[in-house]
Amino acid sequence: MYELVRALTQGSDHIRHDIPCEDHGQVFESESCKIFAVADGHGDTNCPRSQLGSKFACEIAISEMKVFSTDIIDNSWEKRLISPGKDQDSLIRQLITSIVAKWTTAVNEELEENPLSDEEKSGCKRYIDRYDRGERLEHIYGTTLIAGLLTESYLLLIQQGDGR
């Protein structure tokens, strides 16, 4: 089976303007599977916590894909997963829905514990009104997720985000 290699570098524009890297990546390997997750923070002042959103997305994707992989094996669902159709769609949708729901919970809990600072609010000119109304608060942590799960039987790739 393949080896997973991970590298994360801060872009030259971010270095030049002293902007933190808003991206994150993680890998996990076991005897039965290899998992990777890469999250690309939005790089927008209206999303001042993209760095945290990316970290949460990767951590949750890795965790949920571990559970997914185990469930597929324990329930003998490999054939359902690799055969195109309703069962395949349902299994993959459940995985993505679980990742998004847990990410949304994580960012909402983090925001409740650490409300936006005045400095963060000052950069959120486009969306500050809706943030003040408590709407679309997850956008503060905006990120796009790409993740993969590799086993001896299948490679599953998912992408979530950038649905503008």
List the model feature ranges, each with a label.
Residues 1-164:
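PP2C/PPM-type serine/threonine phosphatase catalytic domain
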